[in-house]
From Swiss-Prot:
InterPro entries: MFS, MFS_trans_sf, NO3_transporter. One of its GO terms (cellular component) is plasma membrane. It comes from the Eukaryota. GO terms for biological process: lateral root development; nitrate assimilation; nitrate transmembrane transport; response to nitrate. This is High-affinity nitrate transporter 2.1. Monomer. Heterotetramer composed of two NRT2.1 and two NRT3.1. Interacts with NRT3.1. It comes from Arabidopsis thaliana (Mouse-ear cress). Induction: Up-regulated at transcript level by light and sucrose, and transiently by nitrate, but no changes at protein level. Down-regulated by ammonium, amino acids and N-metabolites resulting from nitrate reduction. Induced by sudden N starvation and by growth on low nitrate concentration. Circadian-regulation. Expression increases during the light phase and decreases during the dark phase. Its main location: membrane. Disruption phenotype: Impaired in the high-affinity nitrate transport. Reduced growth on low-nitrate media. Reduced nitrate uptake and increased lateral root initiation. Pfam families: MFS_1. The chain crosses the membrane at residues 69-89, 105-125, 129-149, 151-171, 193-213, 226-246, 271-290, 310-330, 352-372, 383-403, 410-430, 441-461.
Amino acid sequence: MGDSTGEPGSSMHGVTGREQSFAFSVQSPIVHTDKTAKFDLPVDTEHKATVFKLFSFAKPHMRTFHLSWISFSTCFVSTFAAAPLVPIIRENLNLTKQDIGNAGVASVSGSIFSRLVMGAVCDLLGPRYGCAFLVMLSAPTVFSMSFVSDAAGFITVRFMIGFCLATFVSCQYWMSTMFNSQIIGLVNGTAAGWGNMGGGITQLLMPIVYEIIRRCGSTAFTAWRIAFFVPGWLHIIMGILVLNLGQDLPDGNRATLEKAGEVAKDKFGKILWYAVTNYRTWIFVLLYGYSMGVELSTDNVIAEYFFDRFHLKLHTAGLIAACFGMANFFARPAGGYASDFAAKYFGMRGRLWTLWIIQTAGGLFCVWLGRANTLVTAVVAMVLFSMGAQAACGATFAIVPFVSRRALGIISGLTGAGGNFGSGLTQLLFFSTSHFTTEQGLTWMGVMIVACTLPVTLVHFPQWGSMFLPPSTDPVKGTEAHYYGSEWNEQEKQKNMHQGSLRFAENAKSEGGRRVRSAATPPENTPNNV
């Protein structure tokens, strides 16, 4: 095969995925832009990778993937580190059921605000700074758990640690800027799923660390405190790695590209406006509130549920509870892959149907879990429920990147915050008072999942249609270029600030499924007045 030369991104020719990668420095966080740079993976016109090699560390795409999911997983470990140790902590601090429930609400409420902020940080400063600084700044709060002495301190510290869950937004934003739209479901699902797996890892890790420390001579009430130094140090290590090895965009870091004039410097007010005025944003906020939201709520109660209901030992209850979080290893990527597969044949309409089916099934399995009377039945129902909820998360963020190109960060932040808000609301309604037993709470949570999934039928893209309605027949408004180009005014278009949106629109034409035209309009010929 002949050598390929030329500027990558000028066309799909000349990008074979076999050229030597030399443009990006591993040692320095400052990555210099080089228009002649070649990538280790084949890329599209936006320099996004068109293939996903899971066991590769190719820079910048796969290196970013691994840094992103590991840092997010670290935050999950610390946020839910207290959950498997609650049977010990509640005796030490004299916690009531309401205290434990309030702490669960607090642990996921903090990131409602921080995820909104992280969305803006990603849009304006880049995901590398957002992820690295949040992970490192939250480390002191993790260490602080070792020094709490009462219920108020326990609730407050769990609230503060929960801020770090905003790394989910940087994770999903980062993947959406590094990988092509045809594989974004799988990539987003894998990154977030493996990150969420931290909720399962901590169910195994913290009881083991606690037991090791206790056997080394510490008392039970001292051992659980020392155990929190493990996730605290993980925060510091991952923050340093992300800051030094991460990269905002395929071509370099955002600040460097803005100075070179290759990336438009946007304004917060405008990206916020386009995010909040797009009705699809709020539907996905609700949907994610009852997929990711219920997963977070379950992480807080599932170990205690098995410990109390079936009178299991602490480590046994933790092992079973870990299965819920560990299902993220394959369930969330499977949801994203299912969405990509459906889109290959049915476009965006296939993605929407996939989301509705998976999330509704998860809700029904949740109802079954709440009504299970034997340990075996409860475990089976829990595993199926976890697979449905987590696959629905993957299917959701296989669609979110298409809602807006310009306001991707803000919309990702709002959707992610919806997950935390849904978790806090669910925890408050069903698991923080004596009105419901844990079994009843799980049952009603399942009913809420089924009901809150119905609004997905209202999501309609003029260029692709909805679950029940076809796309627009308008030759202008029914195009991808018009949908994404309409986020820029005429003055901004004259400055060519919308070119990134047009390139994205060209690559997103595959979401039309079998309706895609055989002869697509080249991106350079797309009118500037869309």
